[in-house]
């Protein structure tokens, strides 16, 4: 892995700095950006660029995707919005957004289906 933009005389874009600033230490991000040094998967994990390092990454990624796809799609979307907001907002805005998202989810047909499926020990059947 590497942050190659500097090699080509440009800077990272496509939200690179906006996303990395919350996951990668500033000194590490600066070094890797300024030098375009290649780094290993293990270093990517240590630096905060990767969640885990596994053999058979494609199979693991597909299993993770299936697991997420089996969750309430409205709750997954809400969690994505909250995670994105958490990277840039203060606690009051995040708390307000959590309450607003939860109010939309509670007692929705998909939330009820999630509860029922768990209680009945069966796979849920969500609508989108």
Spans of model-derived segments:
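A general structural signal for well-ordered alpha-helical segments in protein cores
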Residues: 17, 26-29, 65, 75-80, ...
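CoA-thioester-processing core
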Residues: 1-33, 46-47, 60, 64
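Short alpha-helical segment immediately N-terminal to, or the first helix within
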Residues: 32-34, 104-105
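C-terminal long alpha-helix characteristic of the crotonase
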Residues: 1, 7, 41, 47-96, ...
């Amino acid at each position: 892995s590497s942050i190659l933009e500097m090699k080509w005389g440009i800077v990272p874009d496509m939200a690179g700095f906006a996303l990395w600033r919350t996951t990668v230490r500033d000194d590490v991000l600066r070094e890797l950006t300024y030098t375009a040094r290649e780094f290993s998967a293990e270093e990517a994990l240590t630096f905060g660029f990767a969640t885990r390092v596994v053999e058979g990454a494609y199979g693991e990624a597909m299993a993770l995707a299936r697991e997420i796809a089996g969750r309430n799609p409205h709750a997954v979307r809400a969690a994505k919005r909250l995670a994105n907001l958490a990277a840039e907002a203060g606690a009051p805005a995040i708390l307000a957004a959590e309450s607003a998202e939860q109010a939309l989810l509670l007692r929705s047909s998909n939330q009820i289906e999630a509860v029922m499926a768990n209680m009945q020990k069966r796979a849920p059947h969500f609508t989108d």
